[in-house]
Structures are given as C-alpha cells and as structure tokens.
C-alpha cells in the first residue's frame, strides 16, 4: 500500500495532481464525513473537469428507518450507478466510507434500465411514460421535485438529479425536441442534443423486480401478507415509505460500490477505518432496536432483514481498503496550510487591513497563478468588488486550466483553507470574508408549490361580489348554442345554483373559512350587508390614515450620534451582516434622521438577525448627542424572552457606558421599585421588560425609542398602553409573522416595512421528516441530540396527549429526563420550567404549542411533533422555527398515527412543510395559512367579525380600495361591473391538453388575473411552451379575455353574437349616449339602437371570423 503525506486543505488538488491526472485507472476517493465528500467532488470538477467524476451520496436516514431518503439523494445514487455501468473511460468516484458497506443492486442491472433520447428518435410519449413509471419516477400534474414527471398530450416534463428539468416534445411517435426548463417558472431555457435518463431509485418496480420481491418475501418471512399495506403497495407496483431497507428482496444478487469500477485504486485517510467500524456498530444497534420495537407491535407491517442481508461487514470493507494498490493519505501541519492566518497576523502587527497585506503576498508570488475561491456567488461578487477597488486586474474562471499568471483568478470553488503549491497559490474567500456555509435558496420552489395550492378546491366556500357567500361545487362544461363552455358551478341557499363562465372567474374570491351560512340568490340582504361593511371599512381606513398622518405631523429632533463610536460598536458584531440586515439598518438611520417619528415594522424569519438590527437602533438613540438622557424600551411578551434579550443586550453593550436593566416577574418587588425609580430619573438608558413594563406606575425620563418584539402576543389593555407611548416616541416593531392589521398598514403604505429575508451565512436548514410514529427513530433522534450536548422539544397538539407520551418516553428513552409545560399551568410555573430547560436541567420538554413563539434556546435542536396532521401550516412552521437557531443543524420529526388515513389536504400541508426547509419561507407560509385556516383570533374581534361577512380576499381588496381613494391614487380593486361575452364559441381547456382538474382551476384563476393584452400574450407563450400548441377552445378563451378587457374600457356590460351580428349592452351608469349616436351615424347601414338602449350591429358572421369581427367592431367603437 502506498502512503502519501500533504496538507489536508490541499487533499483534492494533490490527490488529482499526483495520482489521477495522468492515470489510466479507476479511482475511489473515500472520506470520513459526508460534507467533505461533497466539497471534494466540487473541487475535483474544478481541478479536472470531466464527465467521469462522480459523487455517490449516502442516505440521509438511519439504518432500518421506515422513512425514505430524500428524493434528490435517491435519484443521484441511481444516476451515478447507471453512469458507472454505461459510461466509458477512467472514472473517479468520491463517496463517504459508509457506502463501502452498502449492498447495492447487481452491477449488470443498470445496463438494462437506462434510456438515451435524441431528436428524431422513434419513441412515443406513452412509451416514455411507461419507461419512467417502471424506473421509479412519479407521475404528477406538474413537476416540482426530482424524480417526478408530467404528461400533457405530446409533451413530457421530468426532473433529473440536481433539479434539472427537461421537456421532451413528440410528434407522430418521434422525439421532436429536447429542452431544459426552469423548474420555478416552468418555461424552457435551452435546447439539448441528447438526454440520458437513469432510474430515479436503486429499486425499480417492474414485473421482474416485483416477482423477485414476492419470492424473496415468502422465502424470508414465510407467508404473503396480503393485508399488509407495504406488501400490497409494492406488489401493486407502488412505492412505499422506507421500502429502500428491503432492497435485497428485489434482486437475485448484489454488488458493492467498487464492483461497478474496473479494479479501482482506493484513496483514503486514517479516519476512514474508524468511520466504517462506527457505522457497523450503528447498524447492528438499530437492528436490535427494530426487533425490540417489532415486539411492541409498532409499525409491525415492516419486515426486518438481518444486517448480513443489507450490509458488508467491517472486516470485508477494511480488507478492501488494505489491498496492495490502494493509497493511504496522512496530513502534514505545514506553514502553507495557514496562509491567511499569517496574513491576518502580519496585517495586525503592521496596522494594515487584511486585504492590504493580502495584495502584498500576491505581489510576492507573482510567478504563481493566484486563485481566490468562493463557495457562494455573493462572496465571489464581494471578492470581485474588493479587487476592483484596489485596481487590480482579475480573471473569472470556471476551471483550473483557465487560470493565468500576472492577474488574480477568481472562481466558484469551495475551500476551507488556503494553501500553496509550486505552481499555484489558492486563497480561500471563506477565511477573508468569514464565509461560513453555502446557503441554498429554494424559496422559488416554495412559491411554486404555494401557487399550485392557490386554486379553488371542490366544496370550498367562495364569495361572489354580487351574490354573496356560496360553495364551489365543481367545474362543469355546458352546451351553449351547440358549443361547449366551461363554467364554475356555485351552490347557494335553497339548493340554488349559479354558473359562472371561466373567463369571469375573478368575480369570486376565496372566503377563507370552512364555516359560514350560504346566501340566497336574488336576496337583497347581501348587498345591504356589503354596503354597511363598506361604510365601516371607510371608517377603518380613515382611522388608519389619521394615525399615520398624526405621526407625520408630529415632528421631532433628528437623532445625531458619534459615527466613529457607532462604527466601533458595529465592528464588534461577530458575524457578517446580510444585505437585508444592512438595508433595514439604513432604513432606520434614515427614519431617525428625517425629523419625523419613526413607525417601522421589521419582518424577518426566526433567527435572521432582527435583534442585531434592534440593538443598532437602540445604540443610535441611547447615544444620541442632541437629547438629554434618551431612553430605549424593549417590550417582549414572555419572561424567558426578556431574560434572553437582557443577556444579549448586556453582552453586546458591555464595552459601552450605557446602563441596561430588565423588568419582569424574575425581578423582585424591591428591585423593581429601584428600577422604576432609576427609569424615571434617567439613570437607565435601555430597559427590557415584559407586561410589567406596561403599567401606569412606570414613568420614563425621556423615552425616545420603543422596540416591540412580537406585538401580536400582547393583550388588549397592554396594546392600549403601547398606543399611548407611540404618539410621541419612535417605534420599531419586530415580527416573523405580523398580525394582519399591522401587515395591512405596511402593505397599504401607512406603515414603513423592512423585510429581512436572507439567512445568516452560518445558518443551516432544519431537516424535516414526515413519518408514522416510530419509537426506534424517536429514540435515535432524542439520544443523538443528547450525545451532541443538546436538548429536545416534544410537542403535542392537546393536553390530553401528554400522559400517553410520558408513558411512551419512559419506555423509549428511560435514560433521559423530561418536564411538562402546557397552557393550563400558571404563567410563573411555565416560566420556571422554561428557565430550567434553558439552563439545561433536563433533556426533553414535553409541551403543547405554547412554545411556538418567543423561545430562543440555541442548544435545543431536535423537535418531535406528535399528531402533526392536527396542526396548521403556520403553527408547524413557527414550531419548527424554535430549533436550528445556532450553528448546529436542527432536526424536526412530524409524526402521524400509524394507521390513520390522512386527507389529501392534510398530506399536502405536511408535504409543504417538509419541502419548505428553505430559510426565510415563514412569512410566505404564514400568509398562505391565514388563507387556508381563515381568520379567527388572528385578527381583533371587531375586524374578525367584519371579515366573516365577506371573507378574507374581498375584505382586503375593499380596504385597499378605500385607502387608495383617500390617498387619491388609482384604484386597482373592485370593478363596478364584469363584462359578459357570448360569441357562440367553444371556450374551455380540453382534458387532453390539461388533464388534472386542480392544475386546470389554477390556470383559470391566473387567467382571471390577466390585466392587459401583453400579459395575455405572455401567458399564451407560456402555455405553448409547457403544454404544446393551443387547442382552438383554449385559444378562444384567451381571445375572449382580450375582448373582455376592451369591453371594460368601453363600458360594455354584455357582448352577444348571433348569425346576423352583435348586440351590445352598455353599463347602466356609463355616459355613452354621444358616442353611440356618433357610431350609429357613421355606420348607418349596420348599426341600430333598440328601445332598451342596446346597440345592434348587423353583419353575417361565420365561425372563424367572429373573433376578428368582434375586435374590429370594438376597435371602431373606441375610435369614435
């Protein structure tokens, strides 16, 4: 065995440069942790660009898990194995040590199951669809995740690993084109000459593998479990959660990873063997735990295979490593491994910036090729900007071979540490810029999911602007004059039905609640109620306007502070500010300096740095040079949050001369009296308090800034006291999910809004799993958190569930301690328990949802949510936001009753929360959840009652319209009428074009929101790109939408056509007499006015010319 020594930071470079670059062999580079494997893979692609460099990821589940691994991982593993089988040339595989122990499908399997597509190839959409189903792809109405595909007539969309979407167009059973498309917009981006499709999973469900499964199941477990849901699903050709743990049952033989290569050289380090031994110990432990759990009849329909069936032994894996031609790497502690540390030290001694010294080092190494590597685009751009400021030349490169001398080469290249070689100097941007991790942005995908959900569900309550509250029954095609037309069928009281043409879908709004009394068609009560409400909304809008105006008129002295002292304070912030944080801070600086009272809402997700923004605002005001003893009050809803803020503020301001105190139930009566006295005298600069601060006995010397954290959690009386302070004080409110009233004020421009949507660089996404209640997984999760020095939350939806969970936890994790907290306990008792949990006096907090806000415990990073289907989307998101707030990754397990059948709505809600691990998606989710769950106690009782009368969407629209009127702005809200168009054409989206009714309703809703011809044309282009050429019926619909938009401009309420021409009815309040008379006199032969004031235009019409003639008629009318 060859042994080699070099700096650890240069592992990937030296491995490739020394062994792989000029070799004719296959290689496997083995790491001892997964993050290193992925980073080395990205580095390897930079150092040696090749199609034959592969990353083989590990499962993100534990051994014997009943939850399937992430679909991206499953698909990437299968794709890698397929390419190793089919691609020619020398290969490099980078993987984690545990993958040497996994038994995989036989090597020759993937040679049979892959498909190479290219234009003009003979293949039909149906044949491709069949191939995809048999290779573990999931068919959906639209594609969102890896491993999904959608069929729309002669177009097939699918998503392959690394979230690459492809669209295959067919024509007469031939592949016409292959295009890549953007998953977020669903629009094609570029054409491809070929596409290779591999299975989406190591297990494919086709007749051969299903037959193997039946035989091997019978051989291993003795009987066919026909009443077993897992067995029924698999034998029926359907995937089942966690079935990957049964992989050997699907094949007659197995292979190891190295069997897929040609006598490969394995490169590993001293930690590899330890990782293998630890994994073997782990899978044996989980096997025993699973057998014990099976005795308790938990999820007993999952059979358990022995370790020898699923894994190689550590002895076999280590023997593989110790073969003669393999390479053992060890690491040296050279000076080259700490280049930036040396630069930093020298810059400190010489009193220069780190970049001044860096450029001196670069000059000294001018004969080398200099590469600065950034792991994220944002730091790449920052590096570029710094180089430009120093007026150095730079060269943007994608691969090492593009690097040049006499310039600085910059690249997207993840490096943990800088290092040097005889030819190159590699500088890690992460060391220069304190770049911590590579944040992934999946917000676009989340928005896509939410857009899909924003459709009308059958049975949902709606509000018609003219007829009131009804129930949407279904989409129904009716025959009008021999032509089919899609209508929305709405049920009203007395079993009356209303049919709304799909092109007028905008006349209905979602009600936003599941319970309401249906209105009666034709009744005047709806219009009366709506008119009354309109007057009340006018009062609300006026009140909001008056509040805003009063603050604008109430001028105050601009806040001035010492900039040098402020900069020193900012420099002590231990992290790099995000762009959103800096924008929010700049907004506050402008507010405080413009001579008017600030009233700003900072809206940002949990842990996104709102508190640091608040502390900088507090510094600006408390250190004001032109105020006498200026004071800052920070008001929070809970004692524990008060203690946390007090500790943070005290630490952050420790080098200043500011006096900071707290006032809450943890402060004794005697101490509270002293604090209040010092507050009144001006000795205290910053006070942090709970409701104790909101008391009439509290007097301030000179309160200049009020910071309110989580305003929605304060009671009515406390809010009244806050209002009295607001009239003469700068106000900064902070929230992750603001109350709708505050949000309304922000959205309508009455309150200033700053949004912090960018996560800090060192925040990791919370990994979320949805699964049946499984004691083995729960035990592992709780112990894993315990052994990494952390604590766990166990959340139940009802107090009644607590006793049962206590019993189960005593059985599952007897070695861990717990305490219980719920809403029926006294506030002091809850605070006491929370303080003990914060201090680490027990391991698990069992609680109801009372912990969903105001808790920041950075070492509590695991959460089990029991019966997660009983909680709302926003609740689930808020709860999950309690974990993963520090540098440790958080793990959330949303458990479901094992045998309870979930409704599609519940499953979709849980799917959203599982998929939306993207940092910063809480604001979007909370807004959407209000739409799903309705209003209830989210809004004050007065507003809540008003919203019940018309529903959330219509209420918001009416309020925005009224404020626009007061502000003398254009109104984009309610229209006085909606034109009805009847041209005797077929108008609908055919099932053979868009078959999924949910997707079709979503498209109809989008059509209802098109506002001009350009938007209609863009929508039409998108439809052609996604679904193919527009059918005549769909094209008619979009043409009618254009005609409807023109009719609205011309005050035309109805446009009807017959064989002999058109009939036009004008809106009753429109003053059109002069225009109509002028039109009739111009077109005397064709135009006539009927006694009921309708305009008749006589012309023989033929089907295909109706649209053209209608457009011409309206154009002529508009020109008069």
UniProtKB/Swiss-Prot annotation:
Q: What is its main location?
A: cytoplasm
Query: Sorted alphabetically, which keywords does the UniProt record give?
Result: ATP-binding, Cytoplasm, DNA damage, DNA repair, DNA-binding, Helicase, Hydrolase, Nucleotide-binding
Matches recorded under SUPFAM superfamilies:
CarD-like, P-loop containing nucleoside triphosphate hydrolases, TRCF domain-like
Q: Which residues form the Helicase C-terminal domain?
A: 777-931
InterPro entries to which the protein is assigned, alphabetical: CarD-like/TRCF_RID, CarD-like/TRCF_RID_sf, DEAD/DEAH_box_helicase_dom, Helicase_ATP-bd, Helicase_C-like, Mfd, P-loop_NTPase, RecG/Mfd
An example of a Gene Ontology BP annotation on this entry? Answer: transcription-coupled nucleotide-excision repair, DNA damage recognition
GO MF: ATP binding; damaged DNA binding; DNA helicase activity; hydrolase activity
The Gene Ontology CC terms held by the record are:
cytoplasm
User: Which EC number(s) does the record attach to this protein?
Assistant: 3.6.4.-
Family named by the database record: In the N-terminal section; belongs to the UvrB family.
Q: Which NCBIfam families match?
A: mfd (TIGR00580)
What is the protein name for this chain? Transcription-repair-coupling factor
The species this protein was found in: Rickettsia bellii (strain RML369-C)
């Amino acid at each position: 065995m060859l042994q080699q020594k070099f700096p650890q930071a240069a592992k990937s470079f030296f491995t490739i440069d020394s062994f792989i670059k000029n070799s004719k062999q296959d290689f496997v580079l083995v790491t001892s942790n997964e993050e290193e494997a992925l980073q080395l893979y990205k580095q390897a692609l930079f150092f040696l660009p090749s199609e034959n460099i592969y990353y083989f990821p590990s499962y993100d589940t534990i051994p014997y898990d009943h939850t399937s691994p992430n679909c991206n991982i499953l698909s990437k593993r299968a794709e890698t194995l397929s390419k190793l089988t089919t691609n020619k040339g020398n290969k490099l595989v980078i993987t984690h040590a545990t993958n040497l122990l996994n038994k995989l499908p036989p090597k020759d399997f993937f040679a049979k199951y892959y498909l190479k597509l290219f234009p003009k190839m003979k293949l039909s959409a149906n044949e491709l669809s069949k191939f995809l189903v048999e290779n573990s792809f999931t068919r959906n109405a639209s594609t969102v995740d890896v491993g999904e595909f959608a069929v729309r007539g002669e177009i097939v969309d699918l998503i392959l690993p690394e979230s690459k979407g492809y669209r295959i167009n067919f024509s007469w059973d031939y592949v016409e084109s292959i295009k890549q498309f953007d998953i977020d917009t669903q629009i094609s981006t570029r054409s491809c000459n070929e596409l290779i499709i591999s299975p989406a999973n190591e297990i494919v469900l086709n007749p051969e593998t299903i037959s193997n499964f039946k035989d091997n199941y019978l051989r291993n477990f003795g009987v066919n479990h026909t009443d077993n849901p897992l067995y029924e699903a698999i034998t029926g050709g359907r995937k089942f959660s966690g079935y990957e743990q049964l992989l050997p049952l699907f094949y007659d033989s197995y292979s190891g990873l190295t069997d897929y290569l040609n006598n490969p050289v394995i490169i590993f380090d001293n930690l590899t063997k330890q990782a293998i031994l630890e994994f073997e110990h782990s899978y044996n432990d989980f096997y025993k735990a699973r057998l014990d759990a099976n005795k308790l009849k938990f999820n007993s329909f999952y059979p358990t295979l022995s370790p020898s069936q699923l894994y190689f032994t550590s002895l076999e894996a280590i023997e593989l490593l110790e073969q003669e031609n393999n390479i053992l790497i060890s690491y040296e502690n050279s000076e080259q491994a700490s280049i930036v540390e040396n630069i930093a030290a020298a810059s400190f001694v010489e009193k220069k910036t780190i970049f001044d010294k860096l450029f001196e080092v670069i000059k000294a190494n001018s004969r080398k090729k200099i590469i600065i590597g950034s792991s994220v685009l944002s730091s790449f751009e920052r590096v570029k900007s710094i180089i430009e400021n120093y007026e150095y030349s730079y060269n943007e490169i994608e691969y090492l071979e593009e690097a040049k001398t006499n310039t600085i080469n910059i690249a997207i290249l993840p490096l943990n540490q800088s290092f040097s070689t005889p030819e190159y100097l590699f500088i890690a941007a992460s060391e220069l810029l304190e770049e911590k991790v590579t944040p992934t942005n999946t917000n676009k995908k989340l928005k896509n999911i939410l857009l899909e959900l924003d459709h009308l569900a059958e049975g949902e309550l709606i509000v018609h602007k003219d007829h009131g509250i009804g129930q949407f029954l279904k989409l129904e095609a009716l025959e009008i004059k021999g032509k089919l037309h899609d209508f929305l069928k709405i049920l009203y009281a007395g079993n009356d039905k209303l049919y709304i043409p799909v092109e007028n879908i905008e006349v209905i709004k979602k009600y936003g609640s599941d319970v309401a009394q249906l209105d009666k068609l034709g009744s005047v009560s709806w219009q009366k109620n709506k008119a009354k409400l309109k007057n009340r909304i006018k009062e609300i809008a006026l009140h909001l306007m008056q509040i805003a105006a009063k603050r604008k008129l109430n001028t105050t002295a601009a806040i001035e502070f010492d900039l040098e002292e402020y900069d020193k304070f900012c420099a002590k912030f231990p992290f790099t500010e995000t762009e959103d944080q800096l924008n929010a801070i700049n907004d506050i600086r402008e507010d405080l300096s413009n001579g008017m009272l600030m009233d700003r809402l900072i809206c940002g997700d949990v842990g996104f740095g709102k508190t640091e923004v608040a502390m900088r605002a507090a510094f600006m005001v408390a250190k004001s040079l032109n105020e006498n003893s200026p004071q800052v009050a920070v008001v929070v809803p809970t004692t524990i949050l008060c203690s946390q803020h007090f500790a943070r503020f005290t630490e952050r301001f420790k080098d200043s001369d500011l006096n900071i105190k707290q006032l809450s139930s943890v402060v004794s009566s005697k101490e509270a009296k002293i604090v209040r006295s010092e507050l009144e005298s001006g000795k205290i600069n910053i006070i942090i308090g709970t409701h104790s601060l909101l008391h009439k006995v509290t007097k301030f010397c000179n309160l200049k800034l009020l910071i309110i954290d989580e305003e929605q959690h304060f009671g009515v009386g406390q809010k009244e006291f806050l209002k009295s302070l607001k009239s003469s004080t700068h106000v900064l409110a902070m929230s992750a999910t603001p109350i709708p009233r505050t949000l309304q004020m922000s959205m309508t421009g009455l309150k200033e809004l700053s949004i912090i949507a960018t996560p800090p660089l060192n925040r990791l996404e919370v990994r979320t799993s949805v699964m049946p209640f499984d004691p083995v997984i729960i035990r592992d999760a709780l112990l894993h958190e315990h052994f990494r020095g952390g604590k766990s939350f166990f959340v139940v939806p009802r107090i009644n569930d607590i006793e049962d969970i206590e019993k189960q936890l005593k059985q599952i994790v007897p070695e861990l301690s717990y305490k219980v907290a719920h809403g029926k306990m006294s506030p002091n008792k809850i605070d006491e328990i929370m303080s003990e949990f914060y201090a680490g006096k027990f391991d698990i907090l069992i609680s109801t949802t009372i912990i969903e806000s105001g808790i920041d415990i950075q070492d509590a990073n695991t959460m089990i949510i029991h019966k997660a289907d009983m909680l709302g989307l926003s609740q689930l998101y808020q709860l999950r936001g309690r974990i993963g707030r520090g540098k440790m990754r958080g793990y959330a397990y949303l458990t479901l009753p094992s045998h309870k059948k979930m409704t599609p709505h519940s499953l979709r809600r849980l799917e959203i929360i599982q998929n939306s691990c993207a940092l910063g998606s809480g604001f979007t989710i909370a807004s959407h959840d209000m739409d799903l769950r309705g209003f209830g106690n989210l809004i004050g009782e007065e507003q809540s009652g008003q919203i019940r009368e018309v529903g959330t969407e219509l209420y918001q629209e009416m309020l925005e319209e009224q404020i626009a009127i007061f502000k003398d702005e254009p109104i984009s809200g309610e229209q006085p009428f909606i034109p009805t168009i009847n041209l005797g054409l077929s108008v609908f989206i055919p099932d053979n074009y868009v078959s999924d009714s949910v997707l079709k309703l979503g498209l109809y809703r989008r059509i209802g929101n098109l506002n001009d011809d350009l938007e209609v044309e863009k929508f039409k282009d998108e439809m052609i790109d996604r679904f193919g050429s527009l059918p005549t019926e769909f094209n008619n619909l979009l043409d009618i939408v254009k005609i409807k938009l023109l009719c609205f401009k011309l005050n035309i309420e109805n446009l009807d056509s017959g064989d002999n021409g058109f009939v036009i009815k004008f809106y009753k309040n429109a003053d059109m007499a002069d225009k109509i008379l002028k039109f009739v006199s111009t077109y005397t032969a064709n135009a006539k006015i009927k006694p009921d004031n309708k305009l008749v235009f006589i012309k023989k019409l033929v089907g295909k010319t109706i649209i053209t003639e209608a457009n011409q008629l309206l154009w002529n009318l508009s020109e008069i």
